[in-house]
Amino acid sequence: MRIEEIDGTGQTLIPGVIDDQVHFREPGLTHKATIYTEAKAAVRGGVTSFMEMPNTNPPAFTQDLLEQKYDTAKHHALANYSFFMGTSNDNLEEVLRTNDKKNDVCGVKIFMGSSTGNLLVDNPILLEKIFEGSEVLIATHCEEERLFKSNLAKFTAENRVLTAADHPLIRDEDVCFESSFRAVQMAKKFGTRLHVLHITTAKELQLFSNMLPL
């Protein structure tokens, strides 16, 4: 067996990074990037495992579309890979079918506030059904849609051009906290594994505690 020895004198060796939230562009926008090109870039930067979000074109709303991503990655990804199942107000049955792949699929992604296309679940009954029925991890984009729309209406009523500076005013602390609070409460109620992505505010940290010794 051939063994390659690499001289690491003066270098720093760290484990490969796991990136749990990447946004690749395949399918639908492959003129921008593909699973191959993004995985290649990831490895180049020290990321050896990735978990990709469902907001491609079309979004990963069905098991067939999700399986197509896995098939592409099997042939072209240069890193370890997994993909999130997408959710909407109309695909509960498909979402719960992810339970059959719980050893392979990293989780179910829920946009509790609108962000991209129709990747949104703001129906409270449907949210509870997903949290209750999911045997895989649920990853959430937490913004309270009702409060967000109310804030947006106030700003657009002023008939001015919105800028980046308005973003934290429209998607403010209450918008974030109320949604994260709801997600945590549902996870506790149903014993669901929950990962709240990209926490925005310090207030939201009050919802979490780490009781495990480090």
Give the role of each language-model region.
Residues 71-87:
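A glycine-rich helix N-cap at a beta->alpha junction
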Residues 16-22, 50-52, 81-85, 106-110, ...:
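Hydrophobic faces of well-ordered beta-strands that scaffold small-molecule active sites
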